[in-house]
Amino acid sequence: MHKFIPSEGTKDKDSLTLLLLHGTGGDETDLIPIARMLEITNASILSPRGKVIENGMPRYFRRLAEGIFDIEDLKFRTNELADFVQSASKTYALDLNRIIAIGYSNGANIAASVLLVRPEILSDAILFRPMIPLVPNTLPNLSSKRVLISAGLHDPIVASYQTKDLFDLLEKVGAKVSIQWQNSGHELTQRDMIAARKWLSLL
């Protein structure tokens, strides 16, 4: 299940697609208000619902415990999501070179996984409250990718070192990655929106 909202502006070579990836317990509508706050008039929205159910809550991949991922399922779901985006790009005539993932929590983690495993699918990414999902056996070259990490200094779910580890990995593989620390926990705040808008304005 997914939601697609075409761009409100004129479709041209600069048109973007925002791939919205919700957190645990969310659905395909959760991040649409967030996308609207970013004020990008030439962006279409593609928002899939996670297919894994944990205690009645949708997620994008299984986990064994808090912060401990089922890596085999993560790999499978990463490729499944990448294949979905590829198929949707044909269905909706989207430019695969202009797809920006905007992920929160579990959605940010699978967005990072797509960057690391199927980098051809995404041009850039905004990751809210992420951690390292996996380290692939073969590291990609992400020198053409731009990534914003927005993390909470008081996040009870993602420790600061886990965020820093992801930053270091993305930097190691060449991504143009920046990190913004918010005076918050795991929840999103207005400061996250300000940071994301500013980052997007520089693309």
Regions found by a protein language model. Give the residues of each.
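Serine-hydrolase catalytic machinery in alpha/beta-hydrolase-like enzymes
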Residues: M1-L94
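Short alpha-helix in the alpha/beta-hydrolase fold that links the catalytic acid
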Residues: L31-I34, A159-L169
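Alpha/beta-hydrolase fold nucleophile elbow
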Residues: A93-G103
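A conserved short beta-strand
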Residues: E120-I132
